[in-house]
Amino acid sequence: NQRFKKLCRLPQLGVYVDEAHHLFGADLEKQIRSSGANKTSLRDTINLLAANTSIVACYNYTGTPYVKNQLLPEVVYAYGLRESIWNGYLKDADPIGFENVKSDEFLNATVTKFWQKYGGRIYDNLNPKLAIYAANVEEAVNEVVPALEEILTRLEIPTTSILLNVGDSKYTKDEDIRNFNNLDVPGSEGNEKQFVVLVEKGKEGWNCRSLFGVALYRSPKSKIFVLQATMRCLRAITDERLTATVFLSKEN
């Protein structure tokens, strides 16, 4: 295409790839070790650029260098969560384990502790938020939200602070999507949504600085999901050293 042709005219080219694990298909072994394997379009594009230009560097970045729990063999430098927290690039993390996370007791303990730690506080003109991950839409709608409404009522917190984002237009409307995208916008309606119930949302790539807590109302087998979901609350928001809280099963 025209863009590719213009890129090929550049005398020197640097390639930067974000979320680089998407360079590989689902079958990592075939993608990397089998010479006859199909290549992904992005890898093909980079290889074509290399053949037609003078690529001086190709940098690939990812927060999850795995495909189906297999570590990518091309990792040359890693800067881990621990180092990022120690050096002040991320919030610190306070994980709290529970025996049974599929219960009203878990939600009650989670919301109560979250509100005790962060309720009424403001960070960079933003209200602190708690994300609650359910396993499926029915569970989010029929179990999590009703229990959450009861808990908030008891704590004298407006139930209008609940936001449901489950990827189903029957329950999540355009206004909800707009509020979800505005969680980090001071003065917006989205900023008033402090309890965000999610299904298959808010994982990889979700950047919400005002997120101070994550609760897994499930015990997923995937370590990658646990990592991607729980680390969402670690984004730094001020120069102050802050701590986010993670509520999950002891197994996770």
Where are the language model's segments positioned?
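Post-DEXD/H (motif II) to motif III coupling segment of the RecA-like Helicase ATP-binding lobe
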Residues: 25-93
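SF2 helicase motor core recognition
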Residues: 195-211, 229-233
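Conserved segment of the helicase C-terminal RecA-like domain
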Residues: 228, 232-252
